[in-house]
Amino acid sequence: WCKQSGEMCNVLDQNCCDGYCIVFVCT
């Protein structure tokens, strides 16, 4: 789970959108 919005992430992170974190889950 991403800790802060805007950090890079992967699809395994629950709130990862297009390679970057968002504050809440993807819509």
Swiss-Prot record:
Q: Where in the cell is it found?
A: Secreted
Q: Name one GO molecular function term.
A: toxin activity
Alphabetized, the UniProt keywords read: Disulfide bond, Ion channel impairing toxin, Knottin, Neurotoxin, Secreted, Toxin, Voltage-gated sodium channel impairing toxin
Report the InterPro entries cross-referenced here.
Conotoxin_d-typ_CS
Top-level taxon in the UniProt lineage? Eukaryota
State the coiled-coil residue ranges: none
- Tissues with expression: Expressed by the venom duct.
- Record-level GO cellular component terms: extracellular region
Annotated S-S bridges: C2-C17, C9-C21, C16-C26
Q: What does this protein do?
A: Delta-conotoxins bind to site 6 of voltage-gated sodium channels (Nav) and inhibit the inactivation process. Induces membrane depolarization and spontaneous repetitive firing of neurons.
Q: Which family does it belong to?
A: Belongs to the conotoxin O1 superfamily.
Q: What is known of its domains?
A: The presence of a 'disulfide through disulfide knot' structurally defines this protein as a knottin. The cysteine framework is VI/VII (C-C-CC-C-C).
Name of the protein described by the UniProt record: Delta-conotoxin TxVIB
Q: What species was this sequence derived from?
A: Conus textile (Cloth-of-gold cone)
